[in-house]
Amino acid sequence: MILTMLGVNGPYPSIKGACSGYLLTSDSGRTRILIDCGSGVLGRLLNECTVRDLSAVVLSHLHFDHMSDMLPMNYLLSAAGVECLKVICPKTPEKVRRILEDGALDLYPTQDMMIGEMKLEFLRVAHPVETYAVRVICDGKTFVYTGDTNECDALTLFAAGADLLLADAGLLRDDWTIKKPHMTSGMCARLARDAGVKMLVLTHINPSYNAEAVLDEAVNDFPEAMVARAGIRISI
């Protein structure tokens, strides 16, 4: 699989950046899944493929920094003559989900399923709204994305042995409390270590943070950690 980072910021984009958006492509190129579609992601997606090339969209949750570009996506689908695009997303918050119900977006509940060559599995995680981590198995490899979450014990088993873990490092240590909705990069590193993953990529980077500071809090527990950057591609 190939993971392309379209946007890596949250809860708002950096200058010339974009919020959460990740394109996962099978080795054959026949299956392409867009995971999250926050502000600024749609234009970057079109550098990689057309909307006709998408097999599905997975929205980890319905906060705007993870789904706001689905609104112009609907306009693009209409212009491209695409009648239906499968979108897997939570049922709540209902008032946000209703925004997605018009047009060509065909909404499916968040549940385990096959999309083309990819097997998708989900885990409810610790965030103020209904939010899911996603595990994707394809081409003999396993990719896990935590979605937005504070510490969640079940993630260790869910991510066990993953070839790549893409984890929410939305906070630095000094900004974290148990009531906050995100992990720190150090927490991500300990999760990766305990789960025995091969590669850790830190994402959902607050634009006010220095990437070096984010990485510094992770490398003691997982020396191979890296900070996500928009535009990079990683072979899994």
Regions found by a protein language model. Name each.
Residues 1-47, 132-147, 164:
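Conserved beta-strand hairpin/beta-sheet module of binuclear metal-dependent hydrolase folds
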Residues 31, 80-86, 195-199, 223:
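A short helix->loop->beta-strand "cap" motif at the edges of active sites that frequently abuts
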Residues 34-38, 55-65, 89-90, 143-149, ...:
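Active-site neighborhood of phospho(di)ester-bond hydrolases with catalytic His/Asp-centered motifs
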Residues 38-41, 92-94, 125-128, 149-152, ...:
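Short beta->alpha connector loops
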Residues 40-86:
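Active-site metal-binding motif and surrounding structural segment of the metallo-beta-lactamase
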Residues 68-77, 98, 210-218:
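Metal-dependent catalytic neighborhoods of phosphoester/phosphodiester hydrolases
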Residues 83-131, 138-139:
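Metallo-beta-lactamase
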Residues 152-233:
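Cap/insert and terminal regions of metallo-dependent hydrolase folds
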